[in-house]
């Protein structure tokens, strides 16, 4: 994953310090592209240990069209907790619960989760019901019927609903491309947290590419990651510098259950990661 480390180095060399919405501060560049050939391995970062369980469950959650953190919390995935908690803190129902106490209530009380665990019409809603259109179903059908189409688009950015979302989509637009029996995917990401978010996104959309390729009888080929504002938060600089000093290891292999022919039939047990060697965990606070 030298490709990722090159991004980190580029930001340190060329980036500008900027204020941001979270008041954390970032070092940022605008406009950057990375390419990952999935024939060379599954691009899961090796210069720190990645939480693959969270990556898989979040992607399945998107594909279900779900927007409530209940499913994630039930599966011990905590990457979205801060946003509904922040909204809950501003409500009349808030009783000075800590984030940990809030998550426990979400996990153990489905009614509480229904009322306070929703993120609004974020990714899953837009993927499966963008103003009445199931984009995932359309994409898969179109890839099969018209693989040369230049309209194989998945869009998460719905301007009419942005003010209802806990966090407007960061990874906003996906385009698929078919050539000689191989499927590629390009993601445009308007905003990317280089330490926490981007390694997660690389693996997630590479996995989506593999899943769509399998159900359309194609071979997964290239994931292209195009970034708008790519930034390192000021409280992540030390962790990123540590990664730059580490030597990337050989990429692992991701094996999908070959019996799955429908995108909606994938379950957590249908993914097996082999030969993943990595450095230790590096932690960092998320900017909300």
UniProtKB/Swiss-Prot annotation:
Active site positions, chain numbering: 170 (nucleophile)
GO CC, one annotated term: cytosol
Binding residues annotated for (6R)-5,10-methylene-5,6,7,8-tetrahydrofolate, in chain numbering: 51, 193, 287
PROSITE patterns: THYMIDYLATE_SYNTHASE
Chief location category: cytoplasm
E.C. code: 2.1.1.45
Source taxon at top rank: Bacteria
Physiological role: Catalyzes the reductive methylation of 2'-deoxyuridine-5'-monophosphate (dUMP) to 2'-deoxythymidine-5'-monophosphate (dTMP) while utilizing 5,10-methylenetetrahydrofolate (mTHF) as the methyl donor and reductant in the reaction, yielding dihydrofolate (DHF) as a by-product. This enzymatic reaction provides an intracellular de novo source of dTMP, an essential precursor for DNA biosynthesis.
Protein name (record): Thymidylate synthase
Organism: Aster yellows witches'-broom phytoplasma (strain AYWB)
Gene assigned in the entry: thyA
